[in-house]
Amino acid sequence: MSLKIEIIKDKILSDNYFVLRNITYDLTRKNGEVIRHKREVYDRGNGATILLYNREKQSVVLIRQFRVATWVNGNPDGRLIETCAGLLDNDAPEVCIRKEAIEETGFAVGEVKKLFELYMSPGGVTELVYFFIAEYTDAQRANAGGGVEDEDIDVLEIPFEQALEMIKTGEIQDGKALILLQYLQISGLMA
């Protein structure tokens, strides 16, 4: 028997930049018991992320940018080392991530490989993130990167082993980066 869900109330609390909803629903459990829940759900749309890697140089491209949510949560300068990422808006995931790669890292990558789709915070955020990797070369640099006009992004080309060490030391705290770096490690692509 699958779970039965009945929406009792769905109220929009904010529709400023993204949509924050307060949803009251009844959930009928497998044993027939009905439980009422009240949850806030943040709908920011779906996104995509990519890790660029170079086997010959044994390097990866990451970015560093200010993230207000991390600053609010105690990150002293609010800057986070991440993989290149962006919201899909109305684009297909691969189209989105190619645009983001050029805007944020400056690299116009060739073949991109979709790995998987993951919910990163399913308890309250609707976002489904599409994960990609792509090999890059210096010849693919189209511009300096750094993002669009309202972004202040540092492009970081880092030795792969150093990036893995940065996870251990806590310098990399972004879940997307951790997942993609560890994928690259276990896949053997950098061996």
Swiss-Prot record:
Homodimer. One of its GO terms (molecular function) is hydrolase activity, acting on acid anhydrides, in phosphorus-containing anhydrides. Keywords: Hydrolase, Magnesium, Metal-binding. Mg(2+) 1 binds at A85, E104. It comes from the Bacteria. GDP-alpha-D-mannose binds at Y17, K38, R39, E40, R67, A85, G86, L87, E104, E127, D150, E151, K176. This is GDP-mannose pyrophosphatase. Residues 43-180 form the Nudix hydrolase domain. It catalyses: GDP-alpha-D-mannose + H2O = alpha-D-mannose 1-phosphate + GMP + 2 H(+). It is an enzyme of class 3 (hydrolase). PANTHER family: NUDIX HYDROLASE DOMAIN-CONTAINING PROTEIN, UDP/ADP-SUGAR PYROPHOSPHATASE. In the dimer, the N-terminal domains are swapped between the two monomers, such that residues of both chains contribute to the active site. The lineage of its organism: Bacteria, Pseudomonadati, Pseudomonadota, Gammaproteobacteria, Enterobacterales. Belongs to the Nudix hydrolase family. NudK subfamily. Nucleoside diphosphate sugar hydrolase that hydrolyzes GDP-mannose as its preferred substrate, yielding GMP and mannose-1-phosphate. Mg(2+) 2 binds at E100, E104, E151. The gene is nudK. GO terms for cellular component: cytosol. Its EC number is 3.6.1.-. GO terms for biological process: nucleoside phosphate metabolic process; ribose phosphate metabolic process. The keyword Hydrolase applies. Its cofactor is Mg(2+). A motif (Nudix box) lies at residues 86-106. Pfam families: NUDIX.
